[in-house]
């Protein structure tokens, strides 16, 4: 699938959930943004940072591989940008990311996101909600005679 079609499809799926995806002029190298995520995690700001990076890239089409964008996001969620700059320059969190990648590959994961569902296996990539409903209903039939009330 070409990038334009991919992002159109994402926008259609997201629109139903109140999330918009803008057309992407480029695919950013997200490694430094991910290192920033590890920094944010250590400073109690991971969720806010992660959501801000998501919006910056997917909604506002910002280049999350650009250090200035990363620092602007970090500042916006209350992180110390001087300390983050040092961490990024020294690649302090790179070994952690590399270990996570190695662990994922060792366990057979090659795409993000990957969801592991007990009684089924794994589902890779951005899938429609109906895919998960179908899988969970199948697992439910095997593991639970009572239907899940919350699934529509």
Regions found by a protein language model. Name each.
Residues 1-60, 147:
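Structural alpha/beta surface segment adjacent to cysteine/selenocysteine redox centers
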